[in-house]
From Swiss-Prot:
Protein name, per record: Large ribosomal subunit protein uL6
Known function: This protein binds to the 23S rRNA, and is important in its secondary structure. It is located near the subunit interface in the base of the L7/L12 stalk, and near the tRNA binding site of the peptidyltransferase center.
GO biological process, one term: cytoplasmic translation
Superkingdom to which the source organism belongs: Bacteria
Organism: Nitratidesulfovibrio vulgaris (strain DSM 19637 / Miyazaki F) (Desulfovibrio vulgaris)
Gene Ontology molecular functions: rRNA binding; structural constituent of ribosome
GO cellular component: cytosolic large ribosomal subunit
């Protein structure tokens, strides 16, 4: 049995979970999230907890058990607390600005790179730090990865866009001797 999949998911107060045939809908103070169900898994809401069990013991059911439980737990956390990722822009002349739902990056190109934030995702700037926050962990992570991809941190001077907790492996430059 999946060590993660067998754990029940606690439903906090103010959160409503509806189990359908195709998807599970989670409503909370921060919004609504929907995650698809799997045909080989059974979903049940019992006394303030969501329990996911396997209908069959096939390889796909075993593989999906822990995954679907984690996805549902992420939905519940997303509609209550939300998720956020912080990016740091490092480099002389590198700037980041938020204008409405657009993030404008000036990171050494001849033009500013403008990225649009999808619905439900918010961006804030404090100095050289950009914080992406929203209800869906998947969307927040994808947007943060796309922004980082614009100018990955380089190993010699460390310039670029990096995650706040990321360690950049630095390299020594040329030795330059004869």
């Amino acid at each position: 049995m999946s060590r993660i999949g067998k754990l029940p998911i606690a439903i906090p107060s103010g959160v409503e979970v509806k189990v359908g045939t195709e998807a599970v809908e989670v409503k909370g103070p921060k919004g609504v999230l929907v995650t698809p169900t799997h045909t080989e898994l059974n979903y049940a809401v019992e006394d303030g907890h969501v329990v996911i069990t396997r209908a069959t013991e096939t390889r796909t059911a075993r593989a999906q058990h822990g995954l679907r439980r984690t996805l549902l737990a992420n939905c519940i956390q997303g509609v209550t607390k939300g998720f956020s990722k912080t990016l740091e822009v490092i480099g002389v002349g590198y700037k980041v600005a938020v204008k409405g739902n657009l993030v404008e990056l000036a990171v050494g190109f001849s033009h500013p790179v403008i990225m649009e934030m999808p619905e439900g995702v918010e961006a804030k700037v404090e100095g050289q730090k950009l914080t992406i926050s929203g209800t869906s962990k998947e969307v927040v992570g994808e947007i943060a990865a796309r922004i980082r991809r614009v100018r990955k941190p380089e190993p010699y001077k460390g310039k670029g866009i990096k995650y706040d907790n990321e360690q950049i492996r630095r390299k020594a430059g040329k030795s330059g001797g004869k």
